[in-house]
Amino acid sequence: MINKKIIWITGASTGIGKDLAIKFAKSGWHVAASARRENLLLDLNKINQNISSFPLDVTNTENCKEVVNKIINRFGAIDICVFCTGMHDPNSEKRFNLSKIREIMEVNFFGVMNSVNCIYDHFCEKKNGKIAIVSSVAGYRGLPAAGGYCASKSALTSFTESLY
């Protein structure tokens, strides 16, 4: 269908995900950019015509499956996934807000696991595909006022290493 490579990047609205989306788009890739904040994705679309936005809540399995299907329907396949999903709320750590820490775990760890699970069948079917998972140095050592974030990135690092 289309001979350009297709990369799906989650967490593409800010930070590393946004930077990667722009760099891949400038290199000629079709970038399927996903994040929760649709307004930031729309801003990203304006930067380069090779970037298409696919709003996504990584914690919602049905939404994740829908996004994978939309990307495949639009481009024919997904060649590479880069999962940069992440959130942090330093204020929740200071007050030890368990519900916020659970949300951090849900997004940073389970959300990435969910994304891997949603793309897995597609990669098996086409017998090809690569996954890159962006974690953090916080996955290897504790940081002040960041216990929930560090725990989520540590779990993500261990999960990623188990995929080899």
Where are the regions a protein language model picked out?
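Active-site helix of classical SDR
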Residues: V116, S152
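Substrate-binding pocket helix/loop in short-chain dehydrogenase/reductase
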Residues: S92-E93, N97-M105
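Conserved glycine-rich Rossmann-like NAD(P)H-binding loop of the short-chain dehydrogenase/reductase
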Residues: S27-D43
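Active-site loop immediately N-terminal to the catalytic Tyr-X3-Lys motif
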Residues: K94, R141-G147
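The beta1-alpha1 cofactor-binding region of Rossmann-like NAD(H)/NADP(H)-dependent oxidoreductases
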Residues: L56-E66, L98
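Residue(s) in the substrate-gating loop at a strand-loop-helix junction
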Residues: S136
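Conserved glycine-rich cofactor-binding loop
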Residues: S13-T14
